[in-house]
């Protein structure tokens, strides 16, 4: 029998085995064949795979150069030749025996002389073929080592000598539990071991739990990582244990795939953290795992202490590597990398500021009907490239010196440009910027050495202006080269730019490495992997050969999508499809859709009605074109490489960014929006209808009613943007929101919001159908069930919340969070100030005590923030709960301005300092009384609480203080509050004269101001407004100007809640020695004191929170 034939019977041969086989050894005499197959040529230690006659395979990682496996024909024992002089017989009971090797020399001689082997095999074949005189053996008794032959009806010690060997069909290999439980996104390397990722796994992804038998610590075997499980007292008692157990992760049949995850040696290669949660141990990713990256685990901080291990500390080198890995946004000008695109954009702006040659100033010049920057570029848009032409000494242009400079325009430069710039109206046809001769050491660093360099800028328009001159240094030239490289790389990425072309076949490539790899096939002198049988032309891939074979076939390649006709040329097909035009349109043969162009219907058929053979590996979607599949795969990716330079929004696809720019940042849309805001619209009031009064929310200007509060707010913001919220009483009512319970239809969980229920279903019930949204429900038709039943919600009540108004428009929301989101979206310029926004207060602050301030700072009084409006709203809001009232943290700015009638005599003081040392709630002494205020007189019906502000002292700087003031400044306490004397009143008059043009200070009282501020208040300096209001006795408010001040003839400086309260305060003021009297008693007073009273007034003005001064008409009650 031929040895080759015997080998084919014994071995499962394949093309792969024949290519990889290194040697085939034939064991002499009665032995069978053993074959050595070496692995592929990868960069690994020398490995050998040995295939034996029984179909099994053995791998030797660090084995000898030659390994032979011999199957003994009689004893069925494996013989392993490990030493040239020894033979190891591996019996079936796994015992080994070393014996001297006697037949190895004969075997090697036969291997050296192949002809002799062939002759001996042919002789054996001749002997085996002579079976004419063969007689069956007598029946043999049962022996488990004999092979049964059904044809002979007898057993043989080996292969049947007459009928030959059997044709075995081996069992299908069954994976172990550990390998079968491996997730689809992971794979196990069969050579290196360890678990690797097929695709990107994001951070904070949980894997597990770990499965395997639990053993004691003394029974642990050698494995990758040791994991300990903390057991409860009940579990220990049930198992009769006194210690915690460990996972035994050495048996693939009992564990899951997590036994193959190898431990990390340092913090840099660690991407998983192990911890115990409940009765299970999980792995969680601590960083993004990239494709083909190995998963490596180490213990969490608390779990490491539990298993007596140390966590991996981050070294300084690892910290630098991690910092560089996080920077995924490179700058192609200075080779720096940044973490985010915003940082990269800010860095690029710094490059634009440094480059003075390409700086552009703002202007308004835009040409009409002029030449554009190539096809498809809008007028006024800057050129993408600036051509740098280096002129030699004799004036000739050098082609080698041409460089393309990439310009990065900012948004302002994009909008407007001045005439003398690149986008101006008047531009020369060629702007020349001469550059002086560079030093010799600088010239040697450049590619060219001309004496004069000229920078020629390609103009946009044809008019001429005075040339702009500047100088370029060696750094600018090197930077120009970097910009050119960045421009080339930009073209490689963004466009189908293939500059590297093969001169032999005309194929083009984007990278030079690809071209070099392609040229290797041309250098093989026609030895390409695939060859055409008709023209002997070689090809690299089967796709290239398949497309080439169409040239030799008679099959026509261009088929009509409307009929069975086909053509061998594209122009014939285009001429043919004209007969399928019906009324100027092409009709899709499948869906009857109509298209005006053949290209459109062709794309439609190819996109929607072709066979979808490209399957997505992440989901069940399939596509008919590979480019559509590539676009779809971006949905499963977290990268957003396309950034909107206007608003900062990021997109995964370039076409989505283009649609966003056309839809949101279209210049026509921006112009219409600006025009709509500036144009005032006139409305004709509608006729009063019978249904107008039935609406709760009404617009009294348009005579329109609205069912919901938000409809009225939107109407006011669009139709009446100048109208204030305070002018609409309905918008000051609390917002009523429904309170619902959201039930999970798959378990007994209940949530307070639909978003939390949705997150619960996605996490705990994957694949389950989500309940419909309440906002998208449609009213049920006749005979249909209520659609609210399908939402699995229940109304439990309502919640009333005070409205939160936007300080920049008329919008109002039920929570501050939504208002802040509105500001960030609609008012981005005020987004930084959104954290300091409070509900605006517009009520006047009217003192409840005589407004007498003395020069010694020991005197003080309490100013109560109460007036008619506050009193009325307090009485009206008594029925509301405390949830609807404004909290105590709401504040006002209070301004005290002493005004003098005489403008001569003393030096002008510089500032008046008002220091507030205490803020406390103030209760009205007549809360139990019935309201005496007409509701129709209210201008601001918002309820606010009353506060008492205790003024400790007023200090006037710019002139020497009186001795009493100096003494009070040294020791000041609220107990020094007392009435004023005549001396104090005189000093007060001197301090308060000449105050009309001086600066005053406002006291700013934010909410929770005592919690974070170590001093009493925050002082802000503000100038005196030109007109104010003075409290007078006649009930008419008079504006105070610089040249005219009305004297106060009455001593009533305070507006009280009622007349009885006013009389009580007047009595207490007179008994305290206050030198303020009505004019009827002026004869009994000191003339100097009376003069002081007539020349001193006090102005009390309120200012809302950042919205300007609110001058209130103040009169006596």
Swiss-Prot record:
Region (N-terminal PR domain): 201-305
Domain SET, first and last residues per copy: 182-300
Cited InterPro entries: PRDM10_PR/SET, SET_dom, SET_dom_sf, Zinc_finger/UBP_domain, Znf_C2H2_sf, Znf_C2H2_type
Region (Disordered): 97-142, 361-386, 440-474, 919-943, 958-1001, 1066-1094
Pfam families: PRDM2_PR, zf-C2H2, zf-met
Polar residues: bias regions: 924-934
Post-translational modification Phosphoserine, affected residues: 398
Cross-link (Glycyl lysine isopeptide (Lys-Gly) (interchain with G-Cter in SUMO2)): 354
Residue ranges with Basic residues bias: 361-381
Positions where Phosphothreonine occurs in the chain: 402
Cell compartments where the protein resides: Nucleus
Domain-related comment: The SET domain is degenerated, suggesting that it has lost methyltransferase activity.
Role noted for this protein: Transcriptional activator, essential for early embryonic development and survival of embryonic stem cells (ESCs). Supports cell growth and survival during early development by transcriptionally activating the expression of the translation initiation factor EIF3B, to sustain global translation. Activates the transcription of FLNC.
Name of protein: PR domain zinc finger protein 10
Source species of the chain: Pongo abelii
Underlying gene: PRDM10
């Amino acid at each position: 029998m031929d040895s080759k034939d015997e080998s084919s019977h014994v071995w499962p041969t394949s093309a792969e085995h024949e290519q990889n086989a290194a040697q085939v050894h034939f064991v002499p005499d009665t032995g069978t064949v053993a074959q050595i197959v070496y692995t592929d040529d990868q960069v690994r230690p020398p490995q050998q795979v040995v295939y034996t006659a029984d179909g099994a395979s053995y791998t030797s990682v660090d084995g000898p150069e030659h390994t032979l496996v011999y199957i003994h024909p009689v004893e069925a024992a494996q013989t392993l030749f490990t030493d040239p002089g020894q033979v190891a017989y591996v019996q079936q009971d796994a015992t080994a025996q070393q014996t001297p090797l006697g037949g190895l020399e004969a075997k090697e001689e036969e291997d050296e002389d192949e002809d002799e082997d062939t002759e001996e095999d042919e002789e054996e074949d001749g002997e085996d073929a002579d079976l004419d005189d063969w007689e069956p053996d007598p029946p043999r008794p049962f022996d488990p080592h004999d092979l049964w032959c059904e044809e002979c009806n007898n057993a043989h010690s080996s292969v049947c000598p007459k009928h030959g060997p059997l044709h075995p069909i081996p069992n299908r290999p069954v994976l172990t539990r550990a390998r079968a439980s491996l997730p689809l996104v992971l794979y196990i390397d069969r050579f290196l071991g360890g678990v690797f990722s097929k695709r990107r796994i994001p951070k904070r992804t949980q894997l597990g739990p770990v499965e395997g038998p639990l053993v004691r610590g003394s029974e642990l075997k050698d494995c990758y990582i040791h994991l300990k499980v903390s057991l409860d007292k009940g579990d220990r008692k049930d198992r009769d244990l006194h210690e915690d157990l460990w996972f035994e992760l050495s048996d693939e049949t009992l564990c899951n795939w997590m036994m193959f995850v190898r431990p990390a040696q340092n913090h840099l290669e660690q991407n998983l953290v192990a911890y115990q949660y409940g009765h299970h141990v999980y792995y969680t990713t601590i960083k993004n795992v990239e494709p083909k990256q190995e998963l490596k685990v180490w213990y969490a901080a608390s779990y490491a202490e539990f298993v007596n291990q140390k966590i991996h500390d981050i070294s300084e080198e690892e910290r630098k590597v991690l910092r560089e890995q996080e920077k995924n946004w490179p700058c192609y000008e200075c080779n720096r990398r940044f973490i985010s695109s915003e940082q990269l954009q800010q860095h690029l702006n710094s490059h634009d500021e440094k480059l003075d040659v390409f700086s552009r100033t703002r202007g308004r010049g835009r040409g009409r009907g002029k030449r554009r920057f190539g096809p498809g570029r809008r007028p006024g848009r800057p050129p993408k490239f600036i051509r740098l032409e280096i002129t030699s000494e004799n004036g000739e242009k050098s082609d080698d010196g041409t460089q393309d400079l990439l310009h990065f325009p900012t948004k302002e430069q994009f909008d407007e440009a001045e005439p003398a710039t690149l986008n101006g109206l008047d531009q020369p046809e060629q702007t020349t910027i001469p550059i002086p001769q560079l030093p010799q050491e600088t010239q040697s660093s450049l590619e060219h050495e001309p004496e004069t360099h000229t920078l020629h800028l390609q103009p946009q328009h044809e008019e001429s202006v005075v040339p702009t001159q500047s100088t370029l240094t060696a750094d600018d030239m090197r930077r120009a080269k970097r910009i050119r490289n960045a421009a080339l790389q930009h073209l490689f990425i963004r466009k189908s730019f293939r500059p590297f072309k093969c001169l032999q076949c005309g194929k083009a490539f984007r990278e030079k490495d690809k071209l070099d790899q392609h040229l290797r096939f041309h250098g093989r002198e026609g030895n390409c992997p695939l060859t055409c049988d008709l023209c002997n032309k070689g090809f690299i891939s089967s796709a290239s050969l398949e497309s080439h074979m169409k040239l030799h076939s008679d099959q026509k390649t261009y088929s009509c999508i409307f009929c069975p006709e086909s053509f061998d040329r594209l122009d014939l097909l285009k001429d043919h499809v004209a007969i399928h035009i019906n009324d100027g349109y092409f009709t899709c043969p499948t869906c009857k859709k109509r298209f005006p162009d053949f290209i459109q219907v062709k794309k439609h058929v190819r996109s929607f009605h072709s066979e979808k053979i490209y399957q997505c590996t992440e989901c069940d979607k399939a596509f008919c074109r590979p480019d559509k599949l590539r676009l779809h795969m971006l949905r499963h990716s977290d990268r957003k490489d396309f950034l909107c330079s206007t608003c900062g929004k990021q997109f995964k696809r370039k076409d989505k960014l283009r649609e966003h720019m056309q839809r949101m940042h279209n210049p026509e849309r921006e112009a219409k929006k600006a025009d709509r805001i500036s144009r005032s619209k006139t409305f004709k009031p509608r006729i009063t209808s019978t249904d107008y009064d039935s609406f709760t929310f009404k617009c009294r200007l348009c005579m329109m009613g609205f069912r919901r509060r938000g409809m009225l707010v939107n109407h006011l913001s669009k139709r009446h943007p100048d109208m204030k919220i305070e002018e609409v009483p309905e918008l000051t009512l609390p917002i009523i929101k429904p309170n619902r319970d959201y039930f999970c239809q798959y378990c007994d969980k209940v949530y307070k919001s639909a978003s939390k229920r949705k997150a619960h279903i996605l996490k705990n019930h994957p694949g389950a159908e989500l309940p419909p949204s309440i906002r998208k429900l449609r009213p049920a038709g006749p005979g249909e069930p209520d659609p609210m039943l399908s939402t699995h919600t229940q109304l439990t009540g309502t919640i009333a919340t005070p409205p939160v108004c936007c300080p920049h428009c008329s919008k109002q929301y039920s929570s501050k969070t939504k208002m802040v989101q509105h500001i960030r979206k609609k008012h981005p310029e005020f987004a930084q100030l959104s954290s300091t926004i409070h509900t605006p207060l517009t009520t006047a602050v009217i003192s409840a005590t005589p407004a007498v301030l003395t020069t010694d700072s020991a005197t003080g009084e309490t100013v109560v923030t109460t007036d008619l409006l506050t009193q009325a709203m307090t009485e009206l809001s008594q029925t509301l709960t405390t949830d609807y009232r404004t909290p105590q943290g709401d504040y006002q700015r209070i301004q005290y301005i002493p005004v003098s009638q005489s403008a001569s005599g003393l030096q002008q003081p510089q500032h008046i300092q008002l220091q507030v040392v205490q803020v406390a709630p103030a209760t009205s002494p007549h809360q139990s009384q019935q309201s005496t205020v007409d509701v129709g007189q209210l201008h601001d019906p918002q309820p606010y609480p009353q506060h008492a502000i205790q003024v400790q002292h007023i200090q006037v700087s710019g002139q020497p203080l009186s001795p009493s003031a100096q003494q009070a400044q040294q020791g000041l306490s609220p107990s020094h509050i007392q009435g004023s004397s005549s001396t104090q009143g005189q000093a007060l008059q001197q301090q308060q004269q000449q105050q009309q043009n001086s600066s005053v200070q406002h006291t700013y009282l934010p909410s929770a101001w005592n919690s974070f501020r170590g001093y009493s208040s925050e002082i802000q300096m503000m100038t005196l407004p030109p007109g104010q209001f003075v409290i007078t006795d006649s009930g008419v408010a008079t504006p105070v100007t610089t040249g005219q001040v009305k004297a106060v003839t009455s001593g009533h400086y305070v507006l009280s809640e009622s007349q009885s309260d006013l009389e009580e305060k007047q009595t207490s003021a007179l008994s305290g020695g206050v030198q303020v009297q009505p004019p009827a008693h002026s004869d009994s007073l000191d003339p100097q004191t009376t003069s002081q009273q007539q020349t001193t007034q006090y102005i009390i003005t309120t200012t809302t929170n950042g919205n300007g001064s609110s001058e209130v008409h103040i009169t006596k009650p």
